[in-house]
């Protein structure tokens, strides 16, 4: 049985090419597979014979790139057990995308509007938090487990601890009080009305022990101050107030959060990994240093006039043993002294690797730390120029202590430098995601809604880290004023713009690259271009 077949001969200078129009009836009858190799045999000028080979069909698997929304959905699916029902999970998923794509104030109604639910019942969104239908610590556990999995290249776990104040205006919001304004000038102590939270973040390095890092929130704890009883009050009420006041101190709360993180690491199978916690000077005190759990190292700043001591000499006989030896020079005196030599250590800071000059004094003791041995690290300030021809300026020197004398100096310095990322977290959570803008007065909602925003911030950056590993990651073209460097990390604002573009591309059933044109050309002045895409997907906050 024969089938008419069209054959075209193309003669070239070095070869001849034959193009055969394969009959579809033959392909259907023979049940050919995609990728199967066949042979055409020319028997005469009027006849071609098709022969099938027995070669196995090997199809190349396409490398489908997972987008930011795919990774975000995958992570949020892991959080399903943290919700009281599937309906609560679905509602929270809508609020998540509404929070991350909202262009106005990040209130609950703003989340509902951004997710397309402005014409639906809004009370269910408020009840998610007021009736505690979301287990936020369990969501943080999912974030923590994924960060530890992605940061397995580190032989230890690096964490950052700090507190922040969320400004509020309502006097009836639970947990609000007058706080010291950290943004006030040095010569004047200003006060602001707001809530106080403690955040613990884990470092998610991009490339090993020396390189860029993100601080992913794994704990966002509300720390209200104790309410002073009014006069006249019974003595029992005053005694209870004093106990609540001690328990509400930030140093006490921070010590408890560190111990809680250490227990969580042990439960997740990381008992053998050391936990290195970077803190600022407000947590380098007796309350935190003397209550460190097993397997935990603290790296914190101290004053330049801190009084340190050497190890005591062993004395024979009975009696009380000495805990502190002779006085050592203060950190500032160590920096100025020539007896302790400078040594260079490489670490990542301010967008690139630097070589820092440091001085190290081991086996020092401090009365706030008790009998444990400490390591003092003095960091010489880096020089920088505001312009190419300007004079050299210097930053402030840093004085650090570490509770583990055997830890590598490079690890101590890098853990301290990575701690700055938690300050970036606070700024972006407040400015970009509107943490604390939700207008709620229920005690549960006032505590859980800011923590929900912090958890979404961690999920967003974790999804970005996983999506960036794909070679074909779909990303918006960067503006022209950005530096064309692959080492530059994606900002949180760019992540939100990419997420918004990917969601709108799915809704409009368009190709991702069709949204933004790098050049807009018009045939006449009357043809005005539309800048809606740039306005929506290149928002600058």
Predicted regions and their residues:
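Long, compositionally biased stretches
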Residues: 1-14, 33-60, 356-366, 370-372
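Short beta-strand-centered segments at strand-helix junctions
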Residues: 17-31
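Short hydrophobic beta-strand that contains or immediately precedes a catalytic carboxylate
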Residues: 21-22, 160-161, 278, 416
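Single, function-defining residue in the core of a domain
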Residues: 61-80, 172, 209-541
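Structural motif
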Residues: 83-91, 187-193, 439-450
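Gly/Ser/Thr-rich loops at beta-strand to alpha-helix junctions
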Residues: 102, 165-167, 280-285
